[in-house]
């Protein structure tokens, strides 16, 4: 356990969901809270594997003497052999999570000598309501890692199930019974709401979450109120408090967070990306990235590469090593492409760079919000989870991007999308709209902005009990 100030203070226990990209943004917020409340202890509970992954690319958390990064068991029984079931690792973790977290909390309290004064959890952990009650009724403050539209869909799951046909092939039916969702079709919703295996452990967990979140002291989210005012106001009416505290990447960094950190291999690679972008024309570069989890097929990756070659537009492609294949490697090694391929890129800085004019993305929420913060319109190829819903909001509600023709990468479809976004009037309108949203995002994190005020409320809630 990291050293902690001897000054008396509260103890905020933070329970992270260790899969996908849930844990890192939660730890980001924890560090900001810790910097503002140095006498409060923040115990961050996450699996060893997830903690290692986060710390491998960002060691800044180690500077905070009042943040303790702790390990919780992954729920996999000793000697267990995985059989390849969908979400097998998630189900094992979730089944054991309540007991495992309780044991870790008891050990943390015993070691630190501080009782838990506030419980912050990933929103998936609906059982946080019961844990908070068992600890004497401390505040339970869950964090929703995706966007407000997907949160609204989960909170209104029963209403959606009772009022829609559930026909995922009906292109005309939309979700008209929920504020701000009139452009959303049933097939845009995440699995587990009206299609998919509704009886899986994961689907039942999400349904229970939607029922329990209104009991929370507050729910907070990495977004800003001005992006989705209608949905935000509806969620405010459903929760005791609903706090938009983003975009996180635009929040004023603390003095501690702004200090120089040792250069990791990824940081060096990032410097190379930014130096290359410095040499390109304004708004000319297409940035391509599918996050850390999504896996497009080899056929789609080849179609994308062929389209980039044919378009001759400069591009920066963050291509993970586990997505490469011999055919793609051979194609990329020919040297005919007008761009740069790297295994990792510092995405917020890339999207904030003036040379970037388009973002080809899987539409994960963090990527969408970072694109808004950077003022870069999107070309969307969603795959799973909330990504289809995010893409629908991008194209039909905010009108700051477009989805691929046919929904998958083809050479011709990608060329059409690039031409439309970079060269046609429709693309100019998208750029203007996302520039307006960028300005609203910047205003939200100003000293008197909505996200700054909400962050201050979150800080007070977490540290004054």
UniProtKB/Swiss-Prot annotation:
Recorded hits in InterPro entries, A to Z, give: UDP_glucos_trans, UDP_glycos_trans_CS
- Entry annotated with the keyword Transferase: yes
Its pathway, per UniProt, is:
Pigment biosynthesis; anthocyanin biosynthesis
- GO MF annotations in UniProt: anthocyanidin 3-O-glucosyltransferase activity; quercetin 3-O-glucosyltransferase activity; quercetin 7-O-glucosyltransferase activity
So where does an anthocyanidin get bound? Answer: 22, 87, 154, 385
- Which GO biological process categories is it annotated with? anthocyanin-containing compound biosynthetic process
What are the protein's UniProt keywords? Glycosyltransferase, Transferase
User: Mind telling me which Pfam families this protein's record contains?
Assistant: UDPGT
Locate the active site.
22 (proton acceptor), 122 (charge relay)
Q: Which reaction does it catalyse?
A: an anthocyanidin + UDP-alpha-D-glucose + H(+) = an anthocyanidin 3-O-beta-D-glucoside + UDP; pelargonidin + UDP-alpha-D-glucose = pelargonidin 3-O-beta-D-glucoside + UDP; cyanidin + UDP-alpha-D-glucose = cyanidin 3-O-beta-D-glucoside + UDP + H(+)
**EC assignment:** 2.4.1.115
Please tell me where UDP-alpha-D-glucose binds in this chain.
145, 345, 347, 362, 365-367, 370, 386-387
Q: In which tissues is it expressed?
A: Highest expression detected in fruit, with very low levels detected in petal and leaf.
Family statement: Belongs to the UDP-glycosyltransferase family.
Summarizing the function annotation, the protein's role is: In the presence of other necessary color factors, this glycosylation reaction allows the accumulation of anthocyanin pigments. Anthocyanidins are the preferred substrates, while flavonols are only a minor substrate in vitro.
Q: What is this protein called?
A: Anthocyanidin 3-O-glucosyltransferase 2
| UniProt source species | Fragaria ananassa (Strawberry)
UniProt lineage: Eukaryota, Viridiplantae, Streptophyta, Embryophyta, Tracheophyta
């Amino acid at each position: 356990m990291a050293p902690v100030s001897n000054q008396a203070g509260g103890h905020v226990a933070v329970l992270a969901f260790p899969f996908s990209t849930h844990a890192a943004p939660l730890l980001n917020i924890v560090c900001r809270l810790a910097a503002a409340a140095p006498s409060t202890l923040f115990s961050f509970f996450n699996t060893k594997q997830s903690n290692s992954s986060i710390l491998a690319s960002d060691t800044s958390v180690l500077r905070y003497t009042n943040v303790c990064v702790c390990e919780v068991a992954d729920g996999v029984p000793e000697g267990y052999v995985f059989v390849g079931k969908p979400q097998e690792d998630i189900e094992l973790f979730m089944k054991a999570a309540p007991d495992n977290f309780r044991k870790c909390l008891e050990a943390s309290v015993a070691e630190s000598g501080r009782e838990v004064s506030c419980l912050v959890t990933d929103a998936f952990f609906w059982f946080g309501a019961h844990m908070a009650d068992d600890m004497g009724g401390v505040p339970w403050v869950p964090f929703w890692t995706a966007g407000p539209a997907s949160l609204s869909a989960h909170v209104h799951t029963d209403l959606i199930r009772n009022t829609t046909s559930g026909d995922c092939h009906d292109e005309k039916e939309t979700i008209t019974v929920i504020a701000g969702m009139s452009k959303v079709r049933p097939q845009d919703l995440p699995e587990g709401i009206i299609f998919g295996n509704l009886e899986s452990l994961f689907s039942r967990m999400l349904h229970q979450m939607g029922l329990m979140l209104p009991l929370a002291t507050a729910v907070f989210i990495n977004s800003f109120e001005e992006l989705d005012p209608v949905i935000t106001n509806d969620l405010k009416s459903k929760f005791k408090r609903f706090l938009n505290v983003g975009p996180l990447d635009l929040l004023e960094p603390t003095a501690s967070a702004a200090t120089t950190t040792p250069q990791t291999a990824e940081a060096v690679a990032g410097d190379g990306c930014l130096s290359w972008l410095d040499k390109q024309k304004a708004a000319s570069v297409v940035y391509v990235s599918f996050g850390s989890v999504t896996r497009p097929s080899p056929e789609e990756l080849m179609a994308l590469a062929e389209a980039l070659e044919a378009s001759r537009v400069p591009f920066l492609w963050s291509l993970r090593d586990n997505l490469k294949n011999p055919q793609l490697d051979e194609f990329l090694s020919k040297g005919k492409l007008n761009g740069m391929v790297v295994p990792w890129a510092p995405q917020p800085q890339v999207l904030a760079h003036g040379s970037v004019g388009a973002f080809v993305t899987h539409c994960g929420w963090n990527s969408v919000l970072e694109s808004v913060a950077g003022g870069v319109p999107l070309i969307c190829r969603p795959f799973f989870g909330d990504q289809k819903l995010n893409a629908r909001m991008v194209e039909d509600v905010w009108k700051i991007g477009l989805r691929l023709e046919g929904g998958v990468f083809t050479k011709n479809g990608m060329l059409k999308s690039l031409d439309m976004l970079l060269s046609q009037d429709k693309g100019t309108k998208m750029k203007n709209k996302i520039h307006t949203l960028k300005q609203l995002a910047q205003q939200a994190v100003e000293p008197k902005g909505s996200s700054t005020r909400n962050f201050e409320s979150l800080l007070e809630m977490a540290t004054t009990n």
